[in-house]
């Protein structure tokens, strides 16, 4: 243990602990902008500087470890002056039109500036302006970039895609698509991790709420919405709702108040996907098609984009099943339209999805022209849903639990677990078990595949009616790349893989 003093608090912490971690252990928060634990600990923003007694210069707390006998000041006059000056300099290169920014109220830079009582920027504004095709599902605004490098590190270390890179030096430093490529040709999987970890509004998904409003304004248009299983676990946070309050039934109420005509649960089409994937797996397994290479799930459009760009020779190993989103879109404009005696051309199919890649999936030619245009007409992410509710002046606390519309309400429960890693695999295996044996498996028969282990993927072996089935579940594109390489080198062998 190392004995130190932080802001007059004497504590002992393990060797190797950073100053920031030591301060956090006694509930002393240190402002930070670029820090991302274990991923981006480069001290680039210098907002987290602290003063160490006996040293003339300030040090970054995120990447400097404690030493025996250190006396540290996290908010001394010298630290406050330096920190405020640093943030003022950052703001001089930042388009601070917060009122029109999607991250207003949820922006790290905005929070830090407010906490430091910065009410004016004394330096001349020098804002970087770069062109970007805002029709693309992923939108980058260079004028809001603070060069924190989070997007680069997340894309490199977690996803292994290397889409973003830094160029220039000093004040001319900028972040952009690596190798000066256009984002549309850069093999981006549209996983959205760079958006999630961006501390400002420099990265965001394309906002499609206006498309929905235009449909709602058309009296001849029937707006039909579906809500993905994963959304119910993530929505409402920015609206101040607790996990217990943010039920999926309240989303139904919100959408109806906004003017949506019918609201369905994508769990229904997740069941359709599972039946197709389970049936396809049994058929391919029985035919010996999986003896060398596995069948891969096809629900995640980010993963589908990844395999098409990185491992095109393995595309034929994907399940032929559409994603639940696209299956529901097809159902809406065929079975639902027929049942309700509605012209499919009048149906506007809306999807509430957790992922920006779903916007790209909707636009694929594969899902166009089968009936009334695209199967899905508009995709809103969870963040857009929250903004939509605020824009309609709906008080989240007044939302009530409302039931989904019929007839596509009933589900087996298999679709609900799609929102968890391993959920698709577990549901597919349960279906395969029933298709092979004619019996339902035990409730926890496949529970060991839930989650991902420290090696990046979970593997398991099951016996079904005398057949040995090897499966794997992986999350994260870098982990997926490692798994794909191992499969191609014959280091591992699986019959079925969920990504």
Regions from the language model: what does each represent?
Residues 15-69, 75, 79, 205-499:
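Iron-sulfur-associated redox domains of electron-transfer enzymes in respiratory
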Residues 1-9:
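Eukaryote-biased recognition of intrinsically disordered, low-complexity regulatory segments
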Residues 12, 134, 144, 187, ...:
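Charged, low-complexity surface patches
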Residues 162, 195, 385-389:
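Mobile "lid/hinge" segments at catalytic clefts and subdomain interfaces of large enzymes
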